């Protein structure tokens, strides 16, 4: 299975909602195919401790494991990849240091899409499709913006930003390779059930 096939149901952690290890295990049981560790206000030691646990779980469930921003942590916990924003370490530099990592890059517009592609990103995280409480500085791209980038980009696209069970169909109709979800899964009262339901919706569009 190519890595692109595992981008379809991409869950990002947020300990404001739930414990990373608990929420990830439930999400994986429910069908999540990629996990990203995002711990913005934690120490490096904490990130490594949690990352080691998530690495074990993702291997057990045959899912991809990404670390947000932190190349050092991604390498220490033996992650499959890293996801970076436009203000983080350049994709080209990461490829020099860690050529085996899958590199995802955030793109909020065409210019950032072109930069990520030219630097050698493996996939794009495109959004915010809808307004979101989990990333308050995110710029809203909207469905039309997502469609435009999807048509022009040669890379697999993971849509992100405010995606939930009621709007995911509109996102999937844009022809993306996957959807990244935060609060709709890790903030759910029943994470397992929420993940199972989301997985069923995604499978209607991405086999």
From Swiss-Prot:
First-tier enzyme category under EC: transferase
Key words, A-Z: Magnesium, Metal-binding, Thiamine biosynthesis, Transferase
Known EC number: 2.5.1.3
SUPFAM superfamilies to which the protein is assigned, alphabetical: Thiamin phosphate synthase
UniProt binding sites for Mg(2+): 69, 88
Catalysis performed (reactions): 2-[(2R,5Z)-2-carboxy-4-methylthiazol-5(2H)-ylidene]ethyl phosphate + 4-amino-2-methyl-5-(diphosphooxymethyl)pyrimidine + 2 H(+) = thiamine phosphate + CO2 + diphosphate; 2-(2-carboxy-4-methylthiazol-5-yl)ethyl phosphate + 4-amino-2-methyl-5-(diphosphooxymethyl)pyrimidine + 2 H(+) = thiamine phosphate + CO2 + diphosphate; 4-methyl-5-(2-phosphooxyethyl)-thiazole + 4-amino-2-methyl-5-(diphosphooxymethyl)pyrimidine + H(+) = thiamine phosphate + diphosphate
Cofactor: Mg(2+)
Cofactor binding notes: Binds 1 Mg(2+) ion per subunit.
Function: Condenses 4-methyl-5-(beta-hydroxyethyl)thiazole monophosphate (THZ-P) and 2-methyl-4-amino-5-hydroxymethyl pyrimidine pyrophosphate (HMP-PP) to form thiamine monophosphate (TMP).
Gene Ontology CC terms, in alphabetical order: cytoplasm
Name of the protein this chain belongs to: Thiamine-phosphate synthase
Pathway: Cofactor biosynthesis; thiamine diphosphate biosynthesis; thiamine phosphate from 4-amino-2-methyl-5-diphosphomethylpyrimidine and 4-methyl-5-(2-phosphoethyl)-thiazole: step 1/1
Binding annotation for 4-amino-2-methyl-5-(diphosphooxymethyl)pyrimidine: 36-40, 68, 106, 135
Binding site for 2-[(2R,5Z)-2-carboxy-4-methylthiazol-5(2H)-ylidene]ethyl phosphate: 132-134, 162, 182-183
PANTHER family: THIAMINE-PHOSPHATE PYROPHOSPHORYLASE (PTHR20857), THIAMINE-PHOSPHATE SYNTHASE (PTHR20857:SF15)
């Amino acid at each position: 299975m190519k890595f692109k096939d595992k981008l379809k149901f991409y869950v990002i952690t947020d300990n404001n909602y739930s414990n990373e290890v608990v929420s990830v295990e439930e999400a994986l049981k429910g069908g999540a195919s990629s996990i990203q560790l995002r711990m913005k206000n934690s120490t490096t030691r904490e990130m490594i401790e949690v990352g080691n646990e998530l690495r074990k779980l993702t291997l057990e469930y045959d899912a991809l494991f990404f670390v947000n921003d932190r190349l050092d942590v991604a390498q220490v916990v033996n992650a499959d990849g890293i996801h970076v924003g436009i203000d983080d370490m350049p994709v080209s530099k990461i490829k020099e240091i860690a050529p085996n990592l899958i590199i995802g890059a955030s793109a909020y517009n065409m210019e950032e899409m072109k930069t990520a592609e030219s630097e050698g990103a493996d996939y794009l995280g495109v959004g915010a499709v809808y307004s979101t409480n989990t990333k308050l500085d995110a710029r809203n791209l909207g469905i039309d913006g997502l469609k435009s980038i999807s048509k022009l980009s040669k890379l697999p696209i993971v849509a992100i930003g405010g995606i939930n069970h009621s709007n995911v169909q509109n996102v999937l109709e844009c022809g993306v390779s996957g959807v990244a979800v935060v609060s709709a899964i890790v903030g759910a009262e029943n994470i397992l059930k929420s993940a199972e339901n989301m997985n069923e919706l995604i499978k209607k569009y991405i086999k």
